[in-house]
Curated annotation (Swiss-Prot):
GO CC annotation terms, alphabetical: nucleus
Subunit structure: Interacts (via C-terminal domain) with MIP1.
Protein name: Protein XRI1
Effects seen without this gene: Complete sterility.
Major location category of this protein: nucleus
Known role: Required for mitotic division of the generative cell nucleus and the development of mature tricellular pollen grains, and for male and female meiosis.
Localization of this protein: Nucleus
Organism from which the protein derives: Arabidopsis thaliana
Lineage, opening ranks: Eukaryota, Viridiplantae, Streptophyta, Embryophyta, Tracheophyta
Length: 300
């Protein structure tokens, strides 16, 4: 099919691409007409035979493509986005974590060395790799300033008296470390309850126990200390004290009971009027105080 002469094709930027699509289906002996034929009353089963003969992909089989500047830009942007997506998909992460810049060995080497002529690469083995990633056009003066700044920082750390100095070996759990714990061992132990040791009463061999064995311990009679007065134990007759004979007599012969006091019978008065014995008298003083009245009670 002729779309025009060569001048017109060059002005319209016609591009001729010869695409040779070879079907990759396993049904090579089946003709193409049966593969692409779609009936009106039945469903389309073309996707089951070959992926290349879909309606959308059939449009790509055109022999000529009309392209303009706008379409070229869109295709370039689309290709860049697809390449970026592919790059994101191809990102791979390392299984092992990156080692820290300040490892224990490098930090101990920094504290040990007192010289200030150590280079940045010797102290930080990974520093060179970080610097290479910045830019190749960086001037040497910037790196010299970085080295000077690092040297000043290390010098301040070494000259600072308040910085805690770490030991030579960072193996704090090594068996060479010795801790003095004698102060903790001298602490007096806690008061423990001690059981009172009771004397065991031994029974004579002639005694025979009958019945069940009793688990209750018999109450042991402890000898009590009794204090006696010296005069009672060893009296002395020189000082007028009691002798042992007097003590024995008092023990053997208890004191006699005191005799009851016998009162003499009182004289019973009799009444002068009746002659009967008087039981009680009541004397009443008069108002003037000059005289009195006596009332007697008689028996009988």
């Amino acid at each position: 099919m002729d779309y025009g002469d060569d001048d017109r094709s060059s002005s319209w930027n016609w591009q001729v691409d010869n695409y040779n699509h070879q079907p990759q289906s396993h049904f090579s002996d089946v003709p193409d007409c049966t593969m692409t034929e779609v009936t009106l009353n039945q469903e389309d089963h073309s996707y089951m035979f070959d992926d290349e003969n879909t309606p959308v992909k059939a449009c790509s089989e055109l022999g000529y493509h009309v392209t303009t500047e706008d379409t070229n830009r869109k295709m370039e942007v689309h290709s860049e986005t697809r390449s970026a997506l592919k790059r994101r998909r191809m990102l791979q992460f390392e299984d092992q974590p990156e080692t820290s810049l300040f490892s224990s060995e490098s930090f101990s080497a920094i504290l040990k060395s007192s010289a200030r002529d150590d280079t940045f690469d010797e102290l930080l083995p990974e520093g060179s790799q970080l610097i290479e990633g910045f830019s190749e056009d960086a001037s040497a003066s910037s790196f010299e300033g970085l080295d000077l700044y690092a040297e000043e920082w290390y010098a301040d750390c070494l000259n600072d008296a308040e910085t805690p100095m770490l030991p030579d070996d960072l193996n704090f759990g090594s068996p060479d470390v010795q801790v003095d714990i004698s102060e903790y061992l001298n602490v007096p132990p806690e008061t423990e309850t001690r059981e009172v040791q009771r004397p065991v009463t031994r029974s004579s061999p002639n005694v025979i126990f009958k019945g069940r064995k009793s688990f209750s311990r018999p109450v042991s009679k402890l000898p009590s200390s009794i204090i006696y007065p010296f005069a009672f134990i060893k009296p002395c007759g020189v000082h007028g004290g009691m002798t042992l004979k007097d003590i024995n007599q008092k023990i053997r012969n208890p004191p006699a009971k005191p005799k009851a006091h016998i009162e003499e019978p009182a004289v019973i008065q009799t009444s002068a009027f009746s002659g009967k014995p008087v039981v009680g008298k009541t004397k009443i003083r008069t108002e003037g105080g000059k005289g009195s009245i006596t009332i007697m009670r008689t028996r009988g």
